[in-house]
Amino acid sequence: KKGFTRYGDGIKTGIGSEGFIMTYGTEEECIRLLEEFRSSGKKMKAERKDRINSLITEYNSIRTNLPELDKALDWITVTMDELITEQQGKGIYAGLPWFNEYWGRDMFISMPGACLVTGQFDIAKQILKDFAKLQDTDPASETYGRIPNRANLEGILYNTTDGTPRFVIQALEVARYSGDTGF
């Protein structure tokens, strides 16, 4: 309650440009998360800032003679990185805010731009390894051998025909980009 002013259905924080923290859970969980952030928030923020800077300076090697285009490319790099998450292993969300789940085919289509052209080969390899763990391995299943179409915390769907071939294509692309044929 401290530092907030209520305006109708809106809330204005009194903490200026530093933003605000929102937690969800029991009161005890929320207090624990806030205390954790208070003790390490500045360090976390500095680490995040360093990560974003390295994404832009080390991984985004595309530069033009148009500053506005360069800025847009930087934003695309950072925005795409925000979609790389940990849910059921490492993966790429299909899109936020509505598609905060892994769609196999979409993930494999976006992987070159999200990971490979930026040189984040270890992340791409981990995504493939983690998604391979979700393969249907039940010989009695009608979707036996398939890579999921969709994976979220509620379950896994195998209702696609192109997810598995796209998985194989991306494994080949990771090998081609990284030179690592033994991963």
Segment roles from a protein language model:
Residues 100-107, 111-183:
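Aromatic-rich carbohydrate-recognition surfaces in CAZymes
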